[in-house]
Amino acid sequence: MNDELQQQLDSLARDECYRVDAVLKNGQLERTERVFFVGQNGSEQGPYIRKYFDCEAGLGGAYRRILDAQRQGARFLHLPRIFDCYSVGEQDAVVMECVPGKTLADVVYECDPSVELAKRLFPGVCDAICELHERFDPPLIHRDIKPSNFMVEGNAVFVIDLGIARTFDADATTDTKHFGTRAYAPPEQFGYGQTDERSDVYALGMLLFYLLCEETPEVNHIAQALATHNVPSVLRDVVLQAVSFDPADRFQSVKALARAFDSSIAVAQQSSDAIVCGDPYDVGID
């Protein structure tokens, strides 16, 4: 038996030892399941998340980089633990931790948008993306930052769904494939140039807007919406700089964005701008 056939058989065996509890997403290029590992004696462990990606789409590579880093001893505060990556036929599969909590979208819906909510959660969101940018060389660019791709448990924030994340290529001029959620994705993600750390800065600016207004971002109406929601002017400026069309005009790193956000909160609290707080942050988790 040659090595390639043995690898295929091993992958099939690994794939078949899970029981599918629920299909969470089933798209053309990706399928996401909640699964339980079934032992030889019938006992179960889990739940876990299993994702399948079309091999030809070139998706899911970030998971393997994270798995390799974790196997070498790296520990991440804001990323799910990856347990396995393997190929089955024309698909790549990844099995990972099922992160507890609620999505950021659900938290905003339940608590209502406010500066106070942004103050509590946005720093953790930035820290999560910083792990992708700063703990990997070359950095991982998430490319699909949006409220449904962050999980919140208490005040802890985890970034999930790294399917279209890519490794930055200093020699490339554009992304080979164009994916992402249009309301949050920067112009360069759809053919204007290569995505880099500043592309995630743009998406984080859109996500900050959502935390403040709970509206789907429309780039031409952001300034007006921020004013309508009584967002302090210094914080509006942070959002507007983050979502600049030209990457050179944005904050040049997520850390720079996070520092500007912290400073704007401090200034707003000391100024005559009123911080309008929503309901106390409570997502029902002790």
What are these regions (language model features)?
Residues 28-64:
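ATP-binding glycine-rich loop module of kinase domains
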Residues 81-91:
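Short beta-strand micro-motifs within the conserved protein kinase catalytic domain, predominantly
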Residues 174-188:
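Conserved activation segment of eukaryotic-like protein kinases, specifically the C-terminal portion
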